[in-house]
């Protein structure tokens, strides 16, 4: 009997629905080959709906716990209040479902994509594990003496032992399955409250003697990510710094169009999405790159335990760049559905990639 997974699909705004549909084409090919199926439900959550007054409430998020995964396209609209729809939908999902891991693989699919001279696919293969629910994100902002010389704006940065322990432990467990190296990235020399991360790192490291671990300040880590990306395997970091260095990592492997991310609670419903935005100027033209959305499908399948299917998608993406069926990741480098169909054919018909490891 084939396995069945319940998937909620949120296309969102701009190019989001198009690239999500492309990802579903590849998902369908994986279903055919690897003997599982998905039962998909489409949700109309978007920034455009937010403009019309729609809001995502806790009562709307709660039923999603019955699903196995959520596939998200992109959220954002030029006429929406800046950041508010994203906060409503994306932060709503993260907080409501306690998706405490943001997983961002930084993988170079083809040597020609990186701007770093002399680097190859063998040099750049790391995963950024970003804490996804604490730090400064979503905190209240207090403003006093507004409009005067004494105007002051305050918020708060929060780290808990529970939140720190579970994200560092996740990083160690992931490193154990990969190349057994973990690097903590913080700024505890200036932000003393981040010392809790180093304390927890030292405590948990004793339970993972087979994993080499160290810590770097975020400014140094940013430099090393560009100069020596090969020294990184699993990078664990805070919410704010993870947001920044994961985009730097994306630039190292060719740009935001290459990347996918998972907002994960291990063993529970989790959200998977490309890392690019909604790019409204390209919406409806059929020229958006679906590479990130296809990568998100691979991450989702890995989370669901369909590792062989995830590896096949990863191998198909690599093969697409190698053969020229995927010419790039910028808008206009290929037709969205042409790329999706090419990857789907490779997934459906080709052998699993022997050299391609799991996405995360």
Predicted region positions:
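Glycine-rich phosphate/diphosphate-binding loop of Rossmann-like nucleotide-binding domains
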Residues: 8-25, 29-31, 148-219
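Buried hydrophobic positions in well-ordered alpha/beta secondary-structure cores of metabolic enzymes
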Residues: 13-16, 68, 129, 171, ...
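Buried hydrophobic packing segments
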Residues: 23, 27, 201, 293-301, ...
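N-terminal beta-loop-helix "entrance" segment that forms/cooperates
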Residues: 35-58, 223-225
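Short acidic loop-to-helix transition motifs that present clustered carboxylates
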Residues: 46, 111, 216-223
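Glycine-rich phosphate/nucleotide-binding loop
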Residues: 47-49, 107, 225-325
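N-terminal glycine-rich phosphate/adenylate-binding segment common to multiple enzyme folds
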Residues: 50-154, 240
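Internal helix-turn-beta structural module
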Residues: 283, 303-360
């Amino acid at each position: 009997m084939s396995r069945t997974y319940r998937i909620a699909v949120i296309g969102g705004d701009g190019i989001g629905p198009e690239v999500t549909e492309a990802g579903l084409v590849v998902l369908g090919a994986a279903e055919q080959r690897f003997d599982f199926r998905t039962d998909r439900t489409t949700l109309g959550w978007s920034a455009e709906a937010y403009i019309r007054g729609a809001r995502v409430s806790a009562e709307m998020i709660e039923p999603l716990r019955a699903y196995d995964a959520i596939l998200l396209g992109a959220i954002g609209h030029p006429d929406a209040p800046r950041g508010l729809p994203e906060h409503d939908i994306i932060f709503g999902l993260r907080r409501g479902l306690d998706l405490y891991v943001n997983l961002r693989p930084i993988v170079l699919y083809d040597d020609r994509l990186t701007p770093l001279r002399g680097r190859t696919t063998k040099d750049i293969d790391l995963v950024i594990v970003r804490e996804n629910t604490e730090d400064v994100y979503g905190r209240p902002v207090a403003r006093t003496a507004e409009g005067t010389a004494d105007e002051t704006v305050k918020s708060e940065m929060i780290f808990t032992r529970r939140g720190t322990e579970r994200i560092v432990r996740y990083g160690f467990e992931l490193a154990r399955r990969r190349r057994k190296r973990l690097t903590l990235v913080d700024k505890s020399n200036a932000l003393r409250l981040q010392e809790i991360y180093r304390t927890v790192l030292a405590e948990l490291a004793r339970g993972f003697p087979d994993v080499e671990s160290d810590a770097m300040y975020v400014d140094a880590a940013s430099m090393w990510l560009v100069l020596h990306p090969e020294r990184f395997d699993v990078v664990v970091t805070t919410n704010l710094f993870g947001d920044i260095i994961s985009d730097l990592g994306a630039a190292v492997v060719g740009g935001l169009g290459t990347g996918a991310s998972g907002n994960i609670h291990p063993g529970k419903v989790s959200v998977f999405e490309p890392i690019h935005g909604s790019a409204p100027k390209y919406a409806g033209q059929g020229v958006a790159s679906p590479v990130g959305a296809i990568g998100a499908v691979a991450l989702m399948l890995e989370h669901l335990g369909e590792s062989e299917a995830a590896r096949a998608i990863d191998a198909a993406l690599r093969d697409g760049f190698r053969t020229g069926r995927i010419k790039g990741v910028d808008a206009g480098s290929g037709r969205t559905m042409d790329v999706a169909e090419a990857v789907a054919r490779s997934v459906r018909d080709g052998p699993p990639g022997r050299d391609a490891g799991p996405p995360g």
